[in-house]
UniProtKB/Swiss-Prot annotation:
Keywords in alphabetical order: Ribonucleoprotein, Ribosomal protein
PROSITE patterns, per database record: RIBOSOMAL_L17
Phylogenetic classification of the source organism: Bacteria, Pseudomonadati, Pseudomonadota, Gammaproteobacteria, Pseudomonadales
Name used for this protein in its record: Large ribosomal subunit protein bL17
Domain of life: Bacteria
GO molecular function, one term: structural constituent of ribosome
Tagged with keyword Ribonucleoprotein: yes
């Protein structure tokens, strides 16, 4: 039985899942909008939102935790210098998941994942 087991396996090993969501979170913070499948988008929320919450309080320990989870100095800088300040007054719900139809080929449900209150002006195609 699967009672009280949280998270989706997504037909991957645990190390593959961890690496995939780490890379997806870095891409999300870099571009502020990514397109992925709906189940991956829902799981990405569990990885990305705690990182933004961590970035709201700037400390060396929090920066080290963020680097451990993203492995990117540039993204850690953006998290603490831009995103942490942008969402300082927001209590949560930093991501928006928008369904965008089905993928050609396997008919998988697709979704855009974007940061709420992101500056508008970039094209959607650039993030894909």
């Amino acid at each position: 039985m699967r009672h009280r087991k949280s998270g989706r396996h997504l037909s991957r090993t645990s190390s593959h899942r961890k690496a995939m969501f780490q890379n997806m979170a870095v891409s999300l913070f870099e571009h502020e909008l990514i397109k992925t499948t709906l189940p991956k988008a829902k799981e990405l929320r569990r990885v990305a939102e705690p990182l933004i919450t961590l970035a709201k309080e700037d400390s060396v320990a929090n920066r080290r935790l963020a680097f451990d989870r993203t492995r990117s100095k540039e993204i850690v800088g953006k998290l603490f210098n831009d995103l942490g300040k942008r969402y300082a007054t927001r209590q949560g719900g930093y991501l928006r998941i928008l369904k965008c139809g089905f993928r050609t080929g396997d008919n998988a449900p697709m979704a855009y994942v974007e940061l709420v209150d992101r500056p508008v002006g970039g094209s959607v195609e650039a993030a894909e």
